A protein has these predicted regions:
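Bacterial N-terminal signal peptides that target proteins for export
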Residues: 1-11
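Leucine-biased recognition of intrinsically disordered, low-complexity hydrophobic segments
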Residues: 11, 15-17
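N-terminal signal peptide c-region/cleavage motif recognized by signal peptidases
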Residues: 18-23
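Exported/periplasmic ABC-transporter solute-binding proteins
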Residues: 24-50, 54-61, 65-71, 78-81, ...
């Protein structure tokens, strides 16, 4: 059961229907950018096992904060090594289970299907492209997609010119929604999120060296003892899950 982006404490995400006899329920806290891939993976895993998976989706910062406050979760998949580091520093990861699972890239998307491509480089007149419009981004000081986007703009010398026009959203899917709804002409999102949108067009990809590497670590949380959580973590590295991640455009990192 996938739960959409969280606007109230994630503790509620652990409330689900009772699992079948002999089955176990696994609560997965995952970055919002994994929405589409995890929906497919959850369905396949539940069909292959007797277990039930509850997926709570939000910005990695929100999820990490809730885990550190005692939210009952079994698996954490972050879009940022920093937020996984914070959870690990509190002793909340099962030792030896952390793995760098996936990679991603960030892109500039435009509303509609007829936007012209641009070369993302230091002399890009992004403010000119925006005109009087807004640039949709996830929270630039908290959510990984926003942090990566701001770092890329800053590294290219573009941030100061567009900062007043940035419209911040709670997570990357919400930022993308600003663009697909026509509320912002442009946005910065993960390439994988852009691929899932029918009413937005990728007009440029940010150079990989303009921002820190985008890595999604996953780990078994030590906060609860649910044997099936190790099974699900292994499944995330197996062929079915890897194929689902690849279909959404993620780079596979874990062997």
């Amino acid at each position: 059961m996938v739960r959409s982006s969280i606007s109230r404490p994630v503790l509620a995400a652990a409330l689900a229907l009772p699992a079948a006899a002999g089955a176990e329920e696994i609560t997965v806290f995952a970055a919002a950018s994994l929405t589409t891939a995890l929906a497919e993976i959850e369905t396949a895993f539940e069909a292959a096992t007797d277990h039930d998976v509850v997926v709570a989706l939000a910005g990695s910062s929100v999820l990490a904060r809730q885990i550190r406050q005692g939210a009952p979760a079994d698996i954490f998949i972050s879009a940022s090594t920093d937020w996984m580091d914070a959870v690990e520093a509190d002793g909340l990861l099962e030792p030896g289970t952390r793995v760098d699972l996936l990679g991603n890239s960030i892109v500039l998307v435009a509303s509609g299907s007829d936007a012209a491509p641009v070369e993302i480089e230091p002399d890009l007149d992004l403010a000119g492209l925006l005109g009087d419009g807004r640039l949709a981004m996830a929270l630039v000081d908290a959510v990984p997609a926003g942090i990566y986007g701001k770092a890329a703009l800053d590294g290219l010398g573009l941030w100061d010119a567009v900062a007043p026009q940035v419209a911040q959203a709670d997570n990357v899917r919400a930022a993308l929604a600003f663009v697909t709804a026509g509320e912002a002409p442009y946005g910065i999102v993960y390439a994988t999120d852009a691929a899932a949108a029918d009413t937005a067009t990728v007009v440029g990809t940010f150079p990989a060296d303009s921002h820190p590497p985008i890595v999604y670590p996953a780990a078994d949380l030590a906060t609860r003892d649910v044997p099936a959580e190790a099974e699900f973590l292994d499944y995330l590295r197996g062929p079915e899950a890897r194929a689902a991640f690849e279909r959404q455009g993620f780079t596979l990192l874990a062997p």
